Regions:
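Bacterial N-terminal signal peptides that target proteins for export
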Residues: 1-8
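Bacterial N-terminal signal peptides
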Residues: 8-17
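Sec/Tat signal peptide C-region and signal peptidase I cleavage site
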Residues: 18-23
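Fold-level signature of zinc-dependent metallopeptidase catalytic domains
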Residues: 25-55
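Structural recognition of the beta-strand scaffold that forms the well-ordered cores
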Residues: 31-34, 114-118, 138-141, 165, ...
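Metzincin-family zinc-dependent endopeptidase catalytic domain
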Residues: 43-159
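Metalloprotease/metallohydrolase-associated module, dominated by Zn2+-dependent proteases
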Residues: 134-153, 169-212
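Active-site recognition of the HExxH zinc-binding catalytic motif
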Residues: 156-170
Length: 212
């Protein structure tokens, strides 16, 4: 098994995840990916992370398929960057609730389960539940050194964020994908380059996404 240094940002999820409900009625989990550039190294990493979750779904026999749509140079990119910055700057000081402003219509208009922005800002990656409606907004930081020099770290961060949108919260197991917040550590990946899920997380996914 390959070993590497795995580092998670300080805030990966700014609130507790809520387990999905009635997902057996709709196995599709739609993710819209917005990138400014087709050459962004995070784009293939994001597709690999989605493939990881679909492979995990197949291995566990889940009624779940993550379906991606890639959009390059969207006309709403600036609005999404502004929203990402406003969330990141809070650093967890404000959790979604009655006082949380609605997400911009530029996000909700996509009508997807997840809008994932490959941000061009120096922010902390996060997965943010949309206030008063289903769905999540993910922003992935632009850290060119980490992304190019440590691709395993980058793809695990992206897979981690997508995991939150599937209902998985943080855990305190430093050898697992959903650990957070984690300090720098030496973790062991599988043969696909991803950290594993815990047994309890695998069982939770089987419960939430049980086949009919």
């Amino acid at each position: 098994m390959k070993r590497y240094q795995y580092v998670l940002p300080a805030i990966l999820l700014l609130c507790n995840s809520v387990p999905p409900v009635l997902l057996a009625q709709d196995a599709a989990h739609y993710v819209v990916i917005l990138s400014h550039d087709t050459n962004d190294v995070r784009l293939p990493m994001t597709l690999e992370a989605i493939r990881f979750w679909n492979n995990t779904s197949a291995e566990l026999g889940l009624n779940l398929k993550v379906i991606e749509q890639v959009i390059i140079r969207s006309s709403v990119e600036r609005q999404l960057e502004n929203y990402a910055r406003s969330i990141s700057q809070r650093a967890g000081r404000l959790r979604p609730g009655p006082s949380e402003p609605d997400a911009p219509v530029e996000i909700t208009d996509f009508e997807s389960d997840v809008v994932l922005l490959l941000s061009r800002q120096d922010l902390m990656s996060f997965a943010w539940p949309l206030p008063r409606r289903p769905g999540h907004f993910i922003a992935i930081e632009e850290d060119r050194y980490t992304m190019t020099q440590n691709p395993n770290i980058a793809r695990n961060i992206i897979a981690h964020e997508i995991g939150h949108t599937l209902g998985l919260p943080h855990n305190n197991d430093p050898t697992s994908l959903m650990c957070g917040p984690c300090q720098p550590l030496t973790a062991e990946s599988d043969n696909r380059g991803f950290l594993p899920l815990t047994d309890s997380e695998r069982n939770a996914l089987r419960e939430w996404y049980a086949l009919l």
